[in-house]
């Protein structure tokens, strides 16, 4: 059926809701096909002379993914950063993965969505400090937003005049011959948003919204298999390509209503995924399972049954879950695979004042994807 995603469905999230025409036919129940090469990427790793007593390096990486659906096939920036590396400290300045994305532990699926909407997915301009202590890493990131932003764009974060902050702690241990690995990590993030500066009634406003997010990951790798697990809980996870966002806060104040100067309340989301893969050099089998739940808000929402009160992804969805097996074949620099995806979104016809969705009807979709990679 038709799906919610970006880049002509290449970055797939979940199936579209049922939409009946005048004859009660679901117009979204339509099988589709596509063929794209927009994930073609180019990367340059740069190494230069020492500076400030540190080793210097940098990365520039782009792809033909475009920045919007309208610019698909256009070249866009993925990573662009410089790094200063001392004995136990790194300083990274530029655009790279958000602090909630653990490069050491994410689903090894074929699809470009990397497990969304169950897995945080965002790249941000940032300043990042990495402190290493034996098997531990402590990472502090202060970030802005670019391609992965709030509902309506990055203005909400920029208007707050404060960067998004993320603190991450991880433990990674290998055995002597590095055939076994244990990785455990956790992160906590905080951001302030000012979604607008003027109301629809042309009154200045500076109402803000605070949002927190937390995540945990675990990975165990042995010679034959790799097992990974992740859990996320957060407010306004829209910029992480997950369910969530924020809504207008309910009020009975007549002046606030007359001016349209509403406050905001974040929507809460919990998500988890489990990924398993074999580690063969020529053939690998993997299985991903994911679940996400819309928990609504802790405060009453203005006109809570109206879509206009929400600035969120999946505001009328109670849950999403996915089961996705994959078969991967490897030969030299070539990798190809077939991946199945069964995703169910629970759309509700009733919503209470806290944005909690009920009277849910599951809507499912089956997706089959073939991928071909050539690495050079």
Where are the model-predicted features located?
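Outer membrane beta-barrel
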Residues: 1-10, 25-148, 161-162, 166, ...
């Amino acid at each position: 059926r038709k799906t919610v995603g970006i880049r002509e469905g290449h970055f797939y999230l979940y199936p579209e809701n049922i939409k009946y025409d005048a004859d009660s036919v679901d117009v979204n129940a339509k099988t589709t096909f596509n063929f794209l090469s927009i994930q073609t990427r180019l990367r340059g790793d740069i190494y230069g002379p020492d500076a400030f007593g540190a080793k210097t390096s940098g990365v520039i990486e782009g792809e033909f993914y475009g920045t919007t659906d309208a610019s698909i096939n256009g070249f866009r920036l993925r990573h662009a950063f410089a790094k200063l590396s001392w004995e136990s400290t790194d300083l990274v300045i530029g655009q790279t993965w958000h602090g909630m994305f653990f490069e050491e532990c994410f689903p090894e699926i074929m699809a470009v969505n990397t497990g969304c909407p169950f897995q945080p997915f965002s790249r941000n301009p940032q300043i990042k400090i990495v402190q290493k202590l034996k098997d531990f890493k402590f990472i502090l990131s202060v970030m802005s937003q670019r391609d992965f932003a709030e509902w309506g764009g990055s203005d909400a974060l920029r208007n707050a005049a404060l960067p998004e902050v993320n603190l991450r702690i991880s433990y990674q241990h290998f055995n002597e011959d590095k055939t076994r690995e244990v990785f455990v990590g956790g992160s906590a993030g905080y951001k302030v948003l000012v979604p607008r500066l003027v109301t629809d009634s042309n009154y200045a406003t500076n109402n803000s919204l605070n949002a927190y997010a937390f995540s945990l990951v675990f990975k165990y790798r042995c010679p034959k298999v790799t097992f990974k697990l992740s859990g996320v809980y957060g407010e306004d996870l829209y910029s992480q390509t997950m369910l969530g966002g924020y809504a207008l806060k309910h009020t009975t104040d007549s002046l606030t209503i007359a001016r349209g100067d509403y406050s905001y309340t974040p929507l809460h989301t919990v998500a988890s995924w489990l990924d398993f893969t074999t580690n063969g050099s020529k053939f690998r089998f993997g299985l991903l399972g994911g679940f996400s739940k819309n928990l609504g808000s802790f405060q009453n929402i203005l006109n809570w049954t109206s879509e206009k009160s929400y600035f969120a992804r999946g505001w009328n969805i109670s849950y999403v879950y996915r089961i996705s097996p994959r078969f991967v074949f490897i030969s030299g620099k070539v990798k190809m695979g077939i991946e199945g995806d069964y995703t169910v979104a629970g759309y509700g016809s009733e919503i209470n004042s806290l944005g909690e969705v009920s009277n849910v009807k599951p809507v499912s979709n089956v997706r089959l994807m073939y991928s071909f990679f050539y690495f050079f």
